[in-house]
């Protein structure tokens, strides 16, 4: 079975599950599809452990997988409990490439389809990891940035003249899994650093990883906690950094 066939089968199984009303009320297609993609054995899904429920629990290895699109801070209590006895991998889906499909709300017809200029990168996981300062370097915790391509369907029901601003998203459909970038130890964070001068500022980093100044500041703190970079001084008003030896 090819990767594409594996993903397509996972999505079909997820659609059936959601139609039958199985799973959490707020579960969306992407989350459910990735559960089947990462662990086809349905008996490993949504397993109660203590007062929490693991997205995936692989009994033979004692491994837990949590799929979290955003808001890693909401995982703190659950991770605190799980990490005492199990190894946990937090998988963060990142949209690498997206096609936007606009749907007429009256006819249901797709009236336009275009490629979004925004491209996701593995470094997009860093601002989320920033929310877990006490757990980031825990020996039982791994992170995985899952880069995927999607088609997103939105209703043309927004408030501005072209009906796009404030529009409602109908659903996202995963079309391809590009890669999975794992961080299994603090030393692995260094591999997420882009090409940079020997000495660099946050502004240099923001340009290289294509994040805003604020989110780049969060990423810098993650790299500092991991020991990937160190602050060495200032250049004007900006802090200077270098890679750790």
Named regions from a protein language model:
Residues 1-52:
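Acidic-basic catalytic patches of nuclease active cores, encompassing PD-(D/E)XK
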Residues 77-139:
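A basic- and aromatic-enriched beta-loop-alpha substructure that forms the phosphate/nucleotide-
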Residues 111-181:
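Long, low-complexity, charged/polar intrinsically disordered regions in eukaryotic proteins
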Residues 196-208:
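Short acidic, hydrophobic short linear motifs in intrinsically disordered regions
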Residues 224-235:
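A short, conserved structural fragment
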Residues 234-245:
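Short, cationic-aromatic polyanion-contact patches
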